[in-house]
Amino acid sequence: MTRFDITELITGVIQSASIMAAQKKVDIQFYKDGPVYVWGDEFKVEEVITNYLTNAMNHADGQRRIEIRFSYHDGLVRTSVFNTGEPIPEEDLEKIWVKFYKVDKARTREYGGSGIGLSIVKAIMDSFHQKCGVINHENGVEFWMELESNN
């Protein structure tokens, strides 16, 4: 585990995804106010953020907006990726972390999702002994992960 600036990592992921975001007509807002240092495997954290952002772009609807934010509690940094659109059906919330599970198979075919991304996210976060999750909102869905910080 190394200490790194997650804002720098997320900025890079957003830049890498800019062509896809433009094609999908999605507006990405990243709310940051300077460096945020966390502990983890930078490569694996990048994989989690990339997965969350790609899923958000594929499922954004309505205002087609994605918001990335930080919150802090008990020595942890929570990174949240929210997208406007339809909430995930309540009965599917626990299952989305299972390999090959797809909530809407017809929609998944549209963008070519394999159903393994969130299972990889869960495995990575479990390997860090940290939490990840999903929260439905009236106007969209928020995926989050927590990492230790010394901020």
Which residues make up each language-model segment?
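Short conserved segment of the HATPase_c
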Residues: 88-102
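Short alpha-helical Gxxx[C/S/T] motif in the catalytic ATP-binding
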Residues: 112, 117, 121
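A residue-level detector for a conserved hydrophobic packing site
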Residues: 45-46
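Short beta-strand/loop element within the Bergerat-fold HATPase_c
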Residues: 63-75
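Conserved glycine-rich
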Residues: 129-130
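Short helix-loop "hinge" at the ATP-lid/N-box region of the Bergerat-fold HATPase_c
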Residues: 56-57
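Conserved catalytic submotifs in the C-terminal HATPase_c
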Residues: 2-3, 27-36
